[in-house]
Amino acid sequence: MNICLGIITSPHGIKGAVKIKTFTEKPENIFLYGELISGSENYKISLVSVVSNNLVIATISGVNSRNEAELLRNKKLYIERNKLPQLNDEDEFYQNDLVNMEVRLESNELYGYVKSVHNFGSGDILEILVISTKKNIMLSFTKEIFPYINMKERYIVINMPEFIGQ
């Protein structure tokens, strides 16, 4: 299984550098894992600078012009799961681990499933497919709203009585 560590958002300058939105804890961590994978291609990336808490400017081996960099726009960059560090704390997990987990009410009743995890800049958001309505909702991924995660049995508990009609 591959884990997405970032996405190339746009070229930067005329010499082939790119901007990469990172999904790592620290933006510079995307450079710790060697070559990254996108489809059948491998990319060796090097840090130019950290722009913000989730954006870096990087060069890619073999990409030497803005036109070449433009062809990489929106490419997702992956790493093999087994290359990521083992997590020791039960409160630690990779965002990708949440996808397809059951979402249960505090009464243990099935509420829905996690479709994906997003971050638009202000924190993580879970996209949940609600079973009863067959619609997707997005909720801030906070300890108050999701007080318990059971990684072994693959479910999370939602605590929002005013939102879910309890």
From Swiss-Prot:
Domain PRC barrel: start-end pairs: 90-164
A Gene Ontology cellular-component term: ribosome
A single GO BP: ribosomal small subunit biogenesis
Cysteines engaged in disulfide bonds, as pairs: none
GO MF, one example: ribosome binding
Coiled-coil blocks: none
Entries under NCBIfam families matching the protein: 16S_RimM, PRK14592.1
Similarity annotation: Belongs to the RimM family.
Domains as described in the record: The PRC barrel domain binds ribosomal protein uS19.
Protein name from the UniProt record: Ribosome maturation factor RimM
Protein species of origin: Wolbachia pipientis subsp. Culex pipiens (strain wPip)
